[in-house]
């Protein structure tokens, strides 16, 4: 089990079913030391208003020894790589994830998806790309892995993609993991929980990584300090409350 989970949704995304308190309780039960709440960006139909993201600043950083990161799963909106996270949202959040979602960016062709994803990474706003192995959004996998390594953006292996969403992602995700390994980039694991019961669930992710002998030293979830060092290298101010995580 890894002590860090980087992708989950609360009732603020109304197709999810758990609260911040639910996730804290489950993290304590499972030994998760650090997690990120990453509700959908405002361009999704059932997403929270942008005030929700700006107001995350009122959250405590640490509850009963569990660290809480303030995040978003933003939407890649167009071929220029624009995302629905800007202005005060960017400065209020610790973790900016970006990905394709059909209601915002209808599937097109491999070249268009690749160009949009690389543009989002090149913008400097994004720390992590969500579910890049989605078969509905094929991409040039070596090209995105090389770009991710160049721009220091993690590519996600998403456990939900093998269980309840984006079925048929396995082959793409194995290829992505191998390409990231070869490019010297970072992988991030996300449960993509829409209920707290699956917090920290990475069983299927682990199978993908094992299949390509992915190196542990390039997985951000191995420890809170590794993830925090990565975010700080990307410009996030050090968070004093997390010093002992």
UniProtKB/Swiss-Prot annotation:
Cited CDD domains: PHP_HisPPase_Ycdx_like
Chain ranges passing through the membrane: none
Organism: Klebsiella pneumoniae subsp. pneumoniae (strain ATCC 700721 / MGH 78578)
Positions that bind Zn(2+) 1: 7, 9, 73, 192
Amino-acid biosynthesis keyword on record: no
Manganese among keywords: no
GO BP terms, alphabetized: bacterial-type flagellum-dependent swarming motility
Protein name (database record): Probable phosphatase KPN78578_10290
A GO term, aspect molecular function: phosphatase activity
Assembly information from the UniProt record: Homotrimer.
Principal EC category: hydrolase
Matching SMART domains: POLIIIAc (SM00481)
Positions with a binding annotation for Zn(2+) 2: 15, 40, 194
């Amino acid at each position: 089990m890894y002590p860090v989970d980087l992708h989950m949704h609360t009732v603020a995304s109304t197709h999810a079913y758990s609260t911040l308190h639910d996730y804290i309780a489950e993290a304590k039960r499972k030994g998760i030391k650090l997690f990120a709440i990453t509700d959908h960006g405002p361009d999704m139909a059932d997403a929270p208003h942008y005030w929700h993201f700006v107001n995350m600043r009122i959250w405590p950083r640490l509850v009963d020894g569990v660290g809480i990161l303030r995040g978003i799963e933003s939407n890649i909106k167009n071929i220029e790589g624009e995302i629905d996270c800007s202005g005060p949202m960017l400065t209020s959040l610790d973790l900016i994830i970006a990905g394709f979602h059909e209601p915002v960016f209808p599937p097109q062709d491999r070249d268009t998806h690749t160009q949009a994803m690389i543009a989002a990474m090149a913008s400097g706003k994004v720390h992590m790309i969500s579910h890049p192995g989605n078969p509905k959004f094929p991409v040039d996998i070596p090209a995105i892995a090389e770009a991710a390594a160049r721009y220091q953006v993690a590519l996600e292996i998403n456990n939900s993609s093998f269980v309840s969403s984006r079925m048929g992602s396995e082959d793409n995700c194995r290829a992505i993991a191998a390409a990231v390994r070869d490019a010297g980039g970072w992988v991030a694991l996300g449960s993509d929980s829409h209920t707290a019961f699956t917090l920290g669930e990475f069983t299927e992710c682990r199978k993908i990584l094992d299949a390509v002998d992915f190196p542990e030293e390039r997985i951000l979830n191995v420890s809170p300090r590794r993830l925090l060092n990565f975010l700080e290298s990307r410009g996030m101010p050090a968070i004093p409350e997390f010093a002992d995580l």
